[in-house]
Structure formats: structure tokens, C-alpha cells
């Protein structure tokens, strides 16, 4: 017998006509506060993922618990504090990653309209991906498009998001219809959006001056 909230009796909106589609924008995640304890909790979940660190747990766990989680949280918390958005606990304060992810979700909701439910989820931390998928199922959203917010595919980024969604499905008696996007780095619309954002920034702040040593720097999050 399974034990998730969508099991047992049919979920609301179980009829085909009431099944509202949903889009889930999945990002990596963030500590809920810039403190050592919250950073430690986030790092433990993140660095315990076999997609992120492929070393066998028997070898990796002692290193993680005895060294990394004793040393890294305090230093990382201090760095998080320098970029943390001030204010009360709202979607506009706190982690920049959370703020801009939620804003992206709001803008997509405006674009798609009320016929589609748009939610933001995090692979690590909150709002947890499996929790968000469960809430959508309870709301009658049985067709879910899952979009990992990583243009290029990597097992440790987009791959682990799909893993987590699969774990939700494996534990669910009432399963959703799920579609995922592997990557979109070559999509013309994505490239055009980057170019448009860059052009708008230049119009507001001026173009780089090569003679003054100014350059346009493109930064990518690398993996081993």
C-alpha cells in the first residue's frame, strides 16, 4: 500500500474535462535563510544526491559529515548574507534565486493565462518538487509539463530534477501525465531572449568600451 496524498479516492477534478494542465519551473534550490544551520541543511541534501556526487556513500558520507558540513556552512552563510534581499519573509525578500524564480513563474502565468497552472519548485529545499507535484495533483492538474531551468543538459542538474519527478510517480497510485524538456540551449526563442535582454541593458547603461578595457563576459556554471 502506498502512502502519498493522492492515493486512495480520486483526486478533485478527476474527470477528463476538469483536468487543468500545469507547468512546473524547476530550479536548483536555496537555503531558506543565510545562517549556518539553514545552509548546512541545504548542503546536506544537495551534496547527498548521487547525481551530484557519484562517489559511493560509504566513502563520501564521512567526508561530507565530518569535514564539509563542519567547515562550509559558516563561510557560505556569510556569502549568502551579502546577496540576501532585505525585508520581511515574502516572495520579494530573501534569496535572489527564489525571488527571480518566483517572478519568472508569475510572468509565465500572465503569459499563459488562467487555463494553465504555473508553479515554481526547487530540487533541494523548498518548495520541494515532489510536494508541488502532489499539490497540483490534488488540485486536479493531472497533465504536468516539467521544465528544469537549465539550458544545457547535465545529469547533475536537469537529470536529477527528472529523477525526483520519477520518484514521485513511483510512489503515486494516481499518476500524472508528465512531460519534460531535456535542454533548450539551441532554441531560437531562448537565444533571441538573451540577445534582447542584452540589447536592452546596453540601451540603458551603454555598450562596453573596448578601449577602456571593458568586455562582455559570458559566465557558465561548469561541472566536472
Where are the regions that the model predicts?
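Active-site-proximal alpha-helix that buttresses catalytic centers in soluble enzyme cores
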Residues: 2-224
Amino acid at each position: 500500500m502506498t502512502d502519498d496524498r493522492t492515493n486512495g479516492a480520486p483526486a478533485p477534478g478527476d474527470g477528463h474535462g476538469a483536468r487543468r494542465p500545469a507547468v512546473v519551473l524547476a530550479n536548483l534550490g536555496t537555503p531558506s535563510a543565510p545562517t549556518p544551520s539553514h545552509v548546512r541543511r541545504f548542503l546536506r541534501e544537495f551534496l547527498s544526491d548521487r547525481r551530484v556526487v557519484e562517489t559511493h556513500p560509504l566513502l563520501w558520507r564521512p567526508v561530507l559529515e565530518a569535514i564539509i558540513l563542519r567547515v562550509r556552512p559558516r563561510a557560505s552563510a556569510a556569502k549568502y548574507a551579502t546577496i540576501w534581499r532585505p525585508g520581511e519573509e515574502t516572495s520579494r525578500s530573501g534569496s535572489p534565486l527564489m525571488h527571480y524564480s518566483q517572478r519568472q513563474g508569475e510572468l509565465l502565468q500572465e503569459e499563459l493565462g488562467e487555463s494553465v497552472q504555473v508553479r515554481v519548485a526547487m530540487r533541494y529545499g523548498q518548495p520541494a518538487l515532489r510536494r508541488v507535484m502532489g499539490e497540483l495533483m490534488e488540485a486536479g492538474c493531472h497533465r504536468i509539463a516539467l521544465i528544469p531551468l537549465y539550458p544545457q543538459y547535465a545529469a547533475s542538474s536537469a537529470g536529477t530534477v527528472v529523477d525526483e519527478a520519477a520518484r514521485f510517480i513511483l510512489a503515486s497510485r494516481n499518476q500524472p501525465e508528465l512531460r519534460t524538456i531535456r535542454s533548450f540551449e539551441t532554441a531560437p526563442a531562448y537565444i533571441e531572449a538573451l540577445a534582447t535582454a542584452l540589447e536592452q541593458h546596453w540601451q540603458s547603461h551603454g555598450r562596453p568600451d573596448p578601449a577602456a578595457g571593458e568586455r562582455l563576459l559570458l559566465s557558465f556554471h561548469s561541472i566536472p
